[in-house]
């Protein structure tokens, strides 16, 4: 695949579980078909929304294989494959590549609070270990560290397979620095559904979306409209779904989105600890909004 394929509407896929907490492979296959039919450009299993910290390496590889096989070339398959140990992150990236992932989404090393040089070296080792494109996942609200624009651009300049960043913050100064300084091969994606419109208006390349789990066609239309310069249509879609986007984070992701998908009859509402169901009040608000949108 080309690095230029890392654009458009990408879904941060949930991992469906059975009541015994095993992977619900039937539901997983149906989710992949749902996204293929909706026109999703990129499907990303085993990320934060997929409860990756609760998956063992064998489960991650199995999920990637299933998604790859069911996607049948209709969507690009990028897989979450990151952790805070560089050695383990390299192993996960290799395993994902071996399982058929066409790109890797690798989260910044969390908890350790490394220096920018430590972050650079972390991604350098991953880039040298795999041949597929790598998406840097910068989510300072979860990791406790920010991958600076300078570090991201340094990596993009030094390694041809450092192909994109998922910028999951509202730091528009950093976003502008990335968009202005990036090399031609490098994509900048937002990880914030509520910011799709302003992000795309600045010249961003797309979104890695939680809301695409429940409204993939709408997210795809929003991204495509903004990319085509049809801002009036993009504003209409953004206004329609803005409250839903907000409610998907009323509690820690992925609890609200899995609750929503269970309401839609697409998965069972089963989580692996420490993730637990949302409160009754959050459930009520989600239900009201989804009913108003005709989703349930």
Curated annotation (Swiss-Prot):
Which residues participate in pyruvate binding?
49, 208
UniProt pathway annotation: Amino-acid biosynthesis; L-lysine biosynthesis via DAP pathway; (S)-tetrahydrodipicolinate from L-aspartate: step 3/4
GO MF annotation terms: 4-hydroxy-tetrahydrodipicolinate synthase activity
Its predominant location is cytoplasm
Q: Which reaction does it catalyse?
A: L-aspartate 4-semialdehyde + pyruvate = (2S,4S)-4-hydroxy-2,3,4,5-tetrahydrodipicolinate + H2O + H(+)
Give the E.C. number(s): 4.3.3.7
**Where in the cell?**
Cytoplasm
* Signal peptide residue numbers: none
- Which top-level group of life is the source organism from? Bacteria
- Where is the site described as Part of a proton relay during catalysis found in this chain? 48, 111
Checking InterPro entries in the record gives:
Aldolase_TIM, DapA, DapA-like, Schiff_base-form_aldolases_AS
Which keywords does UniProt give here?
Answer: Amino-acid biosynthesis, Cytoplasm, Diaminopimelate biosynthesis, Lyase, Lysine biosynthesis, Schiff base
Output one GO BP term. lysine biosynthetic process via diaminopimelate
Q: Which GO terms describe its cellular component?
A: cytosol
Q: Which residues form the active site?
A: 137, 166
What is any Pfam family matched here? DHDPS
Spell out the subunit comment.
Homotetramer; dimer of dimers.
What PANTHER family does the entry give? 4-HYDROXY-2-OXOGLUTARATE ALDOLASE, MITOCHONDRIAL (PTHR12128:SF66), DIHYDRODIPICOLINATE SYNTHASE (PTHR12128)
Which family does this protein fall into?
Answer: Belongs to the DapA family.
What is the stated purpose of this protein?
Catalyzes the condensation of (S)-aspartate-beta-semialdehyde [(S)-ASA] and pyruvate to 4-hydroxy-tetrahydrodipicolinate (HTPA).
- State the protein's name: 4-hydroxy-tetrahydrodipicolinate synthase
Which organism does this sequence originate in? Chlorobium phaeovibrioides (strain DSM 265 / 1930)
Q: What gene is it encoded by?
A: dapA
